[in-house]
Structures are given as C-alpha cells and as structure tokens.
Amino acid sequence: MMLQHPGQVSASEVSATAIVPCLSPPGSLVFEDFANLTPFVKEELRFAIQNKHLCHRMSSALESVTINNRPLEMSVTKSEVAPEEDERKRRRRERNKIAAAKCRNKKKEKTECLQKESEKLESVNAELKAQIEELKNEKQHLIYMLNLHRPTCIVRAQNGRTPEDERNLFIQQIKEGTLQS
C-alpha cells in the first residue's frame, strides 16, 4: 500500500520506473529524481535496493558453488552470504535469553516476598483476633465484678446518680453487649 500525498497521481497512473528510480535504465538517473521523494518512498526505495543486491549475491553464490554438479541448499548460501547477520541474531537471542531468565527470577523473588508478607500479616491478624477475644472476656469479667460490687456501694457518683441508677445502667450495658456479640 502506498501513501498518496496531495497533488500526486495515483499508483495506477505511474510506471514502476517513476516510483522507484533505480529501475530506470543506468545513466538516466539525475539528482532531481531523488530530491522530491517522501520519507516513506525513500524507505521503500532503500528496501528495494537492498533486496536487489541480496538477490544478486545469492544467485551468484548459487552459480559458483556446486557439489557433485548439484547446487548447494539455499540455507548454506544464506549463511555464506550473511554470517554477520547470523552472529547478530545469535547475540540477540542470547541477550533475550538472559533478559528472560532475569525477568523470571525477579518475578519469582517478588512472588516469594509477597507470600512472606501475606503469611506475616495473617499471623498478626490471628494474634489481634485472639487479643480481641481476650479483651472481650476481660470486659465481661469486670462488668460482672462491678455488678457484684454495686449493691454494697453507697458512694454517690460524680454525676449525681445513685448506685441503683448505676446498676440499671450496668444491666442495660450487659444487654446491649450480649446483643452485639
């Protein structure tokens, strides 16, 4: 697919030599042929030239190398043509393998750390729940002790209530406490 800019003709109206100047006959190219090309067309041109050179090198290598009067396999000529590209791919694979291992190790460490944190928080939660139960029991025991003491207490409270008022308030608190629990 080719992008079309304002003022340009469509691809069907233009020959291949007009789009890609390198397809023109040798010696007919001038600087103006390349001056007004867009970056996209320049990139297409660059790839076309590279492909042309690669095809030419591969075909000449196939013609020159034979074993038992048979042409070599395409993979052999490919590795002869671009050993630096194979090396670059190998190094990239190696770096990718190392990066993937590093990522897996990092993920494993993070998972282990989160697991330890979760276990620690569950332990703290269990301790706090036990402490809550212990405090509830202590509260009930203190309310019971206060209830036993109130009938014998003759001291008036600071707010002016009598021990009987306090006792009724205490019974009400016990009822509310049992309803909440």
Curated annotation (Swiss-Prot):
Gene Ontology cellular component annotations, sorted alphabetically: centrosome; CHOP-ATF3 complex; ciliary basal body; Golgi apparatus; nuclear body; nucleolus; nucleus; RNA polymerase II transcription regulator complex
Protein name in UniProt: Cyclic AMP-dependent transcription factor ATF-3
Chain residue ranges for the region called Disordered: 76-96
Gene Ontology molecular function, alphabetical: DNA binding; DNA-binding transcription activator activity, RNA polymerase II-specific; DNA-binding transcription factor activity; DNA-binding transcription factor activity, RNA polymerase II-specific; DNA-binding transcription repressor activity, RNA polymerase II-specific; identical protein binding; protein heterodimerization activity; protein homodimerization activity
Lineage: Eukaryota, Metazoa, Chordata, Craniata, Vertebrata
BP terms from Gene Ontology: cell fate determination; cellular response to amino acid starvation; endoplasmic reticulum unfolded protein response; gluconeogenesis; negative regulation of DNA-templated transcription; negative regulation of ERK1 and ERK2 cascade; negative regulation of transcription by RNA polymerase II; positive regulation of cell population proliferation
Source species: Rattus norvegicus
Covalent cross-link Glycyl lysine isopeptide (Lys-Gly) (interchain with G-Cter in SUMO2) as placed by the record, residue numbers: K78, K175
Gene responsible for this protein: Atf3
Oligomer and partners: ATF3 alone can bind DNA, but it preferentially forms heteromeric complexes with JUN and JUNB and does not interact with FOS.
Signal peptide: none
Entry similarity comment: Belongs to the bZIP family. ATF subfamily.
Phosphothreonine, modified sites: T162
Localization terms from the record: Nucleus
